[in-house]
Amino acid sequence: MKITSVDATILRDPNSGEETVLVSVSTDEGLTGYGEAVARSRAVKAVVESEAVDEGGWDSGIRTLLLGADPADLAVLWARLRANTFWSCRSGVGHVALAGVDMALWDLAGKLHGVPSWQLMGARRNPRLVPYTTLYHGSGSFQETLARTMDAVEMVLGLGFKAVKVESMPDNVPNPYDTVELVSRVRDRIGLDFPLLLDMGYRWHDFDASALVVKELDQFSLFALEAPFPPDRLDDYRRLANASTTPLASGDQLTAASDYQPLLESETLRFVQGGAARTGVSDMGNLAEAAALKGIGFLPWGWGGGALATSANIHRAVVHDNIPLIEYRPAELYPDAILRTSLATPEPVLKDGEFLLPTAAGLGVDVDLTLADRLRIE
């Protein structure tokens, strides 16, 4: 079996303007694997479909490297891609393009072998696949955000989820000091034993700006405080870790597993974050293992992209015991998010607030190509 085509299609949700790049890798025997990549869409598409431009092997082009290759050996393909595209794809948007292709290759390999993709990653080590639901409903005043969040919390509880994350962004909580009231209200409703995460969206750029708010947050026993600073503000993370008892999480701005090394070495985080649509399924494995060596957990990022990316995160989580929660954007809370709810089905199966072990071949979802054609942009 040989790979015969590698293509990337930009899709845009007409309701939200969100975009994803749908990557397809097809073979001469009629099998196709699909993946997603989330970054600057036109740049990602250009890199995925790139051909050789450098005879020295520094930038051989993703499409050129894959055409004619045997899709069966994923480790060899990933190593080949990383080694021969490093001029453009070592990190950033270039790596996101690799991530989309990598996801498609894992989907294809599972279909080729007739097994769920996670079985090709290793033995099951994670006994529980627990989603957390992120609550973000766009810009507005703090009072609007508070009302929307509390309504969504009721839905989360009604649907049986076991963990939740609230958002304090400049566009939905304009005054960061109101974050304390937001968290207090949610914690009062869900109780102390319900895991609660808080995402600050990198809104602070130094420790001094965060100190007063974070001091007040310690009382709420947060599962994690996500992204207080950009991931390169290591000194500020150290100061915050020393001043607060709240576990810290960061990293969804990063891409390749190697990008995370300074954060891992800083010994300030309880969790790192990365996801299949940006880090790639293969490099998620590398990141999870590197984090485990430091005693750090891994929280897969899953806000962007659709069911393909969600499924890929779940498959990777099966084989790592330091992934306690998986970000999830359920259709019930975001019915108008077409890329999330309709591009690929079925949704992962939930029972008692946990994902059931995937059993279908590949990533276990089917892409609606008719919808993809309708959502595609040039």
Locations of regions flagged by a protein language model:
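A cross-domain feature marking catalytic cores of carbohydrate-active enzymes
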Residues: A37, T133-L135, V166-S168, L198-Y202, ...
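Shared catalytic-loop signature of beta/alpha-barrel
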Residues: S26, A43, K215, S221, ...
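Metal-dependent enolase-superfamily TIM-barrel catalytic cores that perform enediolate-based chemistry
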Residues: P127-S244
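Extended hydrophobic packing segments that form well-structured cores
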Residues: A360-E378
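Glycine-rich, aromatic-flanked loop segments that form ligand/cofactor-binding clefts
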Residues: D102-F142
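Conserved, mostly hydrophobic/aromatic
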Residues: I3, G30, V101, G114, ...
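Structured beta-strand/loop patches that form or line metal/cofactor-binding pockets in enzymes
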Residues: M1-Y34, V38-K45, Y334-T341
